[in-house]
Amino acid sequence: MPCPRLPWLRRHRTSQGSGPSSPSTVSAPNSPSRGEDEDAEEEEGDGTPGSGPILPPTSPMECLICVSPFDGIFKLPKRLDCGHVFCLECLARLSLATAGGGDAVACPMCRAPTRLAPRRGLPALPTQPGLLPRDARAPLPRQGSVRFDRRRGLLYLRPPPPSPGPRKSRTVRAPPPPPPLRLGRPLSRRLSLSSPAWAFNAAVALAVLVAAGLVVSGVYIFFLIPHVTNSGVRPQTVALAPENDFWVSPRPTPVAPWTHAWTRRPTKPDLDLDDTLPEATKDTPELEEATKDPVETQGIPDLPPDQTPKAEIDLNWNPKAQADGKKVQLQQ
């Protein structure tokens, strides 16, 4: 790789050439100095990238980026169109960090683009077997091909298809392939808050949510609520039976209200009135008077309540007279 000269060193050389010179330089004032010729050649060489001589690395067996030795799997030495050689893993990481679809890769040294195969990608770049160590130059038996999945950021080894030979040759087991190498997600799939794609996606998602909310609200207001109010269906209450351990007091049975009723008392002469209650004896005259025949009472003169006929007292027929007689006897 060419090493460009610093600009202040160039100014220092030109100033030295323009200063007071020896008498030999006075005789030829128009002749350019040697330093100016070198600067002009370097400026012409820096005009086109990659046109200068390529400086070899400190060790030809190491990558210029990761400074790791090459191997025959993921550290394969791949040469770009500009002539620089890097390992496959570093080129894969560079492709993931580059925006775009991965159709080309730029050289990290001279920025020269290198077109890649449409479906094969980075593993299809030419390999430099001369930079591999001796143990990696020998082809391994039944070794698969290295694949690069840019969408998943995965570098893996694809196993070879089974050989159509006899079964005895298949018994020789090949060494297990190395685990796939995850390199990260591509730059085009990484969403950041500052990227315009993220803002656009957020705006679209918000618009979709607002539209869905308006549609659901309209269906609920204009269809569901009128249907419920117009329908005569009402929620029915169902009486559930209580549990076995739950006791409910029984309801009191309604009782008819008590009404005062007069009962007719038998009027037999052999009835002992001494055993009856005094309250009942007071009501008996009224009942007897009510039971008398109006024809019989027509010929009997009205007497005051204290006077009773003598015949009734002698015959003990009138219970009231009998009670009055007993009172008179007690008073005497």
UniProtKB/Swiss-Prot annotation:
Membrane topology: Single-pass membrane protein
Organism: Mus musculus
Superkingdom of origin: Eukaryota
Gene field: Rnf225
Biased composition (Acidic residues): 36-46
UniProt protein name: RING finger protein 225
Biased composition (Basic and acidic residues): 280-295, 323-332
PANTHER family in alphabetical order: RING FINGER PROTEIN 225, RING-TYPE DOMAIN-CONTAINING PROTEIN
Region named Disordered: 1-55, 121-187, 259-332
UniProt cross-references to InterPro entries, sorted A to Z: RING_finger_E3_ubiq-ligases (IPR051435), Znf-RING_euk (IPR027370), Znf_RING (IPR001841), Znf_RING/FYVE/PHD (IPR013083), Znf_RING_CS (IPR017907)
Biased composition (Low complexity): 15-27
CC per GO annotation: membrane
A GO molecular-function descriptor: zinc ion binding
A family per Pfam: zf-RING_UBOX
